[in-house]
Amino acid sequence: MFDTSAGSVRPAECTGDGRVGLYVCGITPYDATHIGHASTYLAFDTLQRVWLDRGYDVAYVQNVTDVDDPLLERATATGVDWRDLAAEQVELFRTDMEALRILPPDSYVGVTEVVDEVASAVAELVRRGTAYPVATPDAVVAGAQDLYFDVARAGEDGPWALGDESGYDLDTMAALSAERGGDPERPGKRDPLDPLLWRAERAGEPAWDSVVGRGRPGWHIECAVIALRKLDRPVTVQGGGSDLIFPHHEMSAGHAAALTGEDFACVYAHSGMVAYQGEKMSKSLGNLVLVSRLRAAGVDPRAIRLALLAQHYRADWEWTDELLAESVARLAAWDAWAAAADASATAGADAGEPGELVQLVRERLSEDLDTPGAILLLDLRVATGVPATPVELAAVDALLGVRLGSPAA
């Protein structure tokens, strides 16, 4: 897979012992599930399928950011309790993922489930001198302070240094930090890019008692703690959308390295952004194409999946009605191919053994998850009119996640 930190393709494994760990940043549960979400989780579903096809022992963890400023703001704006909104949206997300046949992680972990563990990690960073307090006059408790991560100290003490993953310059980092939940202008910080580790309680906000005072976790430390708690070190692949490269993945890797003295992951992999009507699909813009609405309109989830697989996971691309129509037509052709399957057809191999087509699909997927290349191979085979063999249909199901012949599958 393409490793963002290296700027090149690297083996998606660490130890060579067949054990692999995948951590993918989950949703903040509001406005779920749009096509951009689905594209990201499908990318790492494909990785998981390739690993499983090779016989690897896969451990996959995904968090749910079930307490965060955007969620709280949406709950306040709509008059809904933030916990109810989170639960409703998580259930919708999981239903959409199941409809798209995206393999579930071994562990879904909500941030609210690990507040104590996060607080303990923050306390450890304070003890090591990698975290420091900042005056917080609007805290509920007089004298309570927010806690921040000292990026300079972390870079001096451990294997991580600011910019290792993203490769961005400081001006780009500052702009992205301000745009993506950071506070580079906050007085009292040692460095404008130092990220929040623990937010002291504010009036009207959820908070928990902890070893570092009453409050709630910062964004990046949540993922670091969950990954370290649930997966072997180092994580084989840390994944997410390319909008998470900085600050989220950069800083979560820094937090993990500061806690362990080791690199967080072997590969940092990122999916491209999806646009709609000329703009990046985003909650803030409201230009969302929701999987649930497509399903409610009668679109076969397999066609949605094929539309996503037709794009390389690292590419930025745009969702259009024409793209969906192409996938609907492709699915119809593939279904007809499956319906004409002849159990005695060998296509150059025994019907119970992988033939050339299956091997070629495996090769394409092994090259940085080249799903467009794999789909082209299937299109060419379907166009020949040669009936599918059972093993070929099983491979399409296992490797691409498309079960042919049944819209309900």
From Swiss-Prot:
One of its GO terms (molecular function) is cysteine-glucosaminylinositol ligase activity. The keyword rRNA processing does not apply. A motif ('ERGGDP' region) lies at residues 179-184. GO terms for cellular component: cytosol. A motif ('HIGH' region) lies at residues 27-37. Its cofactor is Zn(2+). It comes from the Bacteria. Binds 1 zinc ion per subunit. InterPro entries: Cys-tRNA/MSH_ligase, Mycothiol_ligase_MshC, Rossmann-like_a/b/a_fold, tRNA-synt_1_cat_dom. L-cysteinyl-5'-AMP binds at C25, G26, I27, T28, T40, N63, V64, T65, W219, G241, S242, D243, V274. Pfam families: tRNA-synt_1e (PF01406). A motif ('KMSKS' region) lies at residues 280-284. GO terms for biological process: cysteinyl-tRNA aminoacylation; mycothiol biosynthetic process. Its EC number is 6.3.1.13. It catalyses: 1D-myo-inositol 2-amino-2-deoxy-alpha-D-glucopyranoside + L-cysteine + ATP = 1D-myo-inositol 2-(L-cysteinylamino)-2-deoxy-alpha-D-glucopyranoside + AMP + diphosphate + H(+). Keywords: ATP-binding, Ligase, Metal-binding, Nucleotide-binding, Zinc. Zn(2+) binds at C25, C223, H248. Catalyzes the ATP-dependent condensation of GlcN-Ins and L-cysteine to form L-Cys-GlcN-Ins. Monomer. Belongs to the class-I aminoacyl-tRNA synthetase family. MshC subfamily. HAMAP family: MshC. NCBIfam families: mycothiol_MshC. This is L-cysteine:1D-myo-inositol 2-amino-2-deoxy-alpha-D-glucopyranoside ligase. It comes from Clavibacter sepedonicus. The lineage of its organism: Bacteria, Bacillati, Actinomycetota, Actinomycetes, Micrococcales.
